[in-house]
Curated annotation (Swiss-Prot):
Signal peptide location: none
InterPro entries reported in the protein's UniProt record: AP_axis_regulatory_Homeobox, HD, HD_metazoa, Homeobox_CS, Homeodomain-like_sf
Gene: HOXA13
Record's function text: Sequence-specific transcription factor which is part of a developmental regulatory system that provides cells with specific positional identities on the anterior-posterior axis.
Protein's name according to its UniProt entry: Homeobox protein Hox-A13
Organism: Ambystoma mexicanum (Axolotl)
Compartment(s) of residence: Nucleus
Length: 107
C-alpha cells in the first residue's frame, strides 16, 4: 500500500464550481465574491471611559494580577467582558515594565 488508504488528493487549482448558499428567502443567493461587502473580523477599537479606567487602575494598584472573582466583579461593574478585563491587566503590566525599563536606561 502507498499509505493513502484510497484517499484522493484534490488541489484547489483544479476547476471547481463556486459554492453557492441559498437563502430561505426567494431570489436571494449569496456568492463568495460578495464576501467583501460584509466586513468581518476585528471590531473597531472603542476607548474605555474614565469610569472604567478608574476602576481598572484602582484594582491594579491593589494587585497586578487579577483573580477570577475580581475579574467577574470588574466585568459586571464596568460593563466590559471578562476577556477585556484580562487583556487590560496584561497590557497594563507590559506598560509598567516598559516605563520601569525606560527609567533604568535614562538614569
Amino acid at each position: 500500500t502507498n499509505g493513502w488508504n484510497g484517499q484522493v488528493y484534490c488541489s484547489k487549482e483544479q476547476g471547481q464550481p463556486p459554492h453557492l448558499w441559498k437563502s430561505s428567502l426567494p431570489d436571494v443567493v449569496w456568492h463568495p465574491s460578495d464576501a467583501n461587502s460584509y466586513r468581518r473580523g476585528r471590531k473597531k477599537r472603542v476607548p474605555y471611559t474614565k469610569v472604567q479606567l478608574k476602576e481598572l487602575e484602582r484594582e491594579y494598584a491593589t494587585n497586578k494580577f487579577i483573580t477570577k472573582d475580581k475579574r467577574r466583579r470588574i466585568s459586571a461593574t464596568t460593563n466590559l467582558s471578562e476577556r477585556q478585563v484580562t487583556i487590560w491587566f496584561q497590557n497594563r503590566r507590559v506598560k509598567e515594565k516598559k516605563v520601569i525599563n525606560k527609567l533604568k536606561t535614562t538614569s
